[in-house]
């Protein structure tokens, strides 16, 4: 059963594309609107506000792209390029960038909405016995502090994933789910994070996963590198709060730092409950100050990993620091139906063979 699950994950994450391509050489990929969450900060880490679309330059594999929509914080997206213009001859997909059919539910200009879809993933493994109530308090305060435009889902994990509260604007439902969690069992962080990211991909607009972890992963079969790449390709930013001192968990620290940086998020290492609250407050501020940029990729024969670079234009702006995801892998058409049309179950998920 474990072998079957690994084969499923291999297909799910697109790791077997090379083998499949040998059997069917006419594999195409889907490239629709690419959305970026971009943080701009000064040397002191303070957010730079009031920037315009013309202040940003976006490159994909070194190819200059045209910004299609632009928004700051939770403001509605401003249409910078009309759909007909963005999808004209300059941006019409080549053979390797076939557009999705309506059934594939592509991200479009009209699908971008204000606010973020925030998935909170809470560690309820046996690592969490100490400080469990303080962690619940910090999460509850975070939920109450998010802007009204944001929607929230609350999941918890130990060996399995529990979808305690589906994505909703109802804060009371989320708070009830937070208070109803109990601690116990081992921790399969990367298995459950993969499933959470997959759920997030079913929704339009900005997508964020906030992980609260109190210990290392000791049960997953999914490597963190695969989770990070899937999140990058899906445009899901990952934020991680670990209650373990970075010095005590050097391996986990490196993994958390790399995963969050690759997806445009951040990692925090909290030594006490006050640090936990400060970390959640920092994430809340980040969500409120992110710039959202989108573009239709120009023809690009590269069906593999595509590097994304975002720069600020103008000598007066080059001193600022940019944080966003650094690339993505176009989605194979043969997997698009499963990934884009599946809806998350509301029950617990226990992967076979774990």
Report residues per predicted region.
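Scaffold/interface architecture of coatomer-like assemblies
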Residues: 20-354
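Bacterial N-terminal signal peptides
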Residues: 7-18
């Amino acid at each position: 059963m474990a072998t079957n699950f690994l084969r499923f994950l291999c297909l799910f994450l697109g790791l077997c594309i090379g083998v499949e391509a040998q059997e069917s050489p006419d594999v195409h990929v889907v490239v629709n609107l690419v959305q970026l969450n971009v943080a701009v900060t000064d040397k002191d880490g303070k957010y730079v506000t009031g920037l315009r679309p013309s202040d940003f330059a976006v490159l994909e594999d070194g190819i200059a792209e045209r910004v299609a929509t632009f928004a700051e914080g939770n403001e509605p997206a401003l249409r910078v390029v009309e759909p007909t213009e963005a999808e004209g001859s300059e941006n019409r997909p080549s053979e390797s960038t076939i557009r999705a059919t309506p059934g594939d539910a592509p991200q479009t200009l009209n699908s971008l909405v204000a606010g973020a879809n925030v998935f909170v993933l809470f560690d309820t493994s046996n690592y969490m016995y100490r400080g469990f109530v303080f962690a619940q308090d910090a999460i509850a305060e975070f939920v109450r502090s998010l802007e009204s435009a944001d929607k929230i889902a609350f999941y918890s994990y130990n060996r399995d994933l529990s979808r305690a509260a589906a994505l909703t604007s109802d804060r009371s439902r989320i708070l009830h789910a937070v208070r109803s969690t109990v601690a116990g069992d081992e921790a399969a962080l990367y298995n459950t994070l993969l499933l959470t990211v997959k759920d997030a991909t079913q929704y339009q607009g900005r997508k964020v996963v906030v992980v609260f972890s109190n210990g290392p992963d000791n049960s997953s079969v999914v490597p963190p590198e695969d989770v990070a790449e899937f999140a990058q390709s899906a445009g899901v930013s990952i934020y991680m709060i670990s209650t373990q001192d970075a010095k005590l968990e050097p391996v986990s620290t490196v993994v958390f730092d790399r995963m969050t940086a690759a997806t445009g998020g951040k990692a925090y290492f909290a030594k006490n409950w006050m640090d936990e609250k400060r970390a959640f407050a920092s994430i809340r501020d980040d969500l409120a100050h992110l710039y959202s940029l989108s573009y239709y990729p120009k023809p690009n024969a590269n069906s593999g990993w595509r590097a994304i670079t975002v720069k600020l234009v103008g000598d007066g702006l080059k001193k600022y620091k940019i944080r966003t995801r650094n690339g993505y892998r176009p989605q194979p058409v043969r997997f698009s139906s499963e990934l884009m049309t599946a809806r998350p179950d509301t029950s617990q998920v226990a992967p076979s063979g774990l």
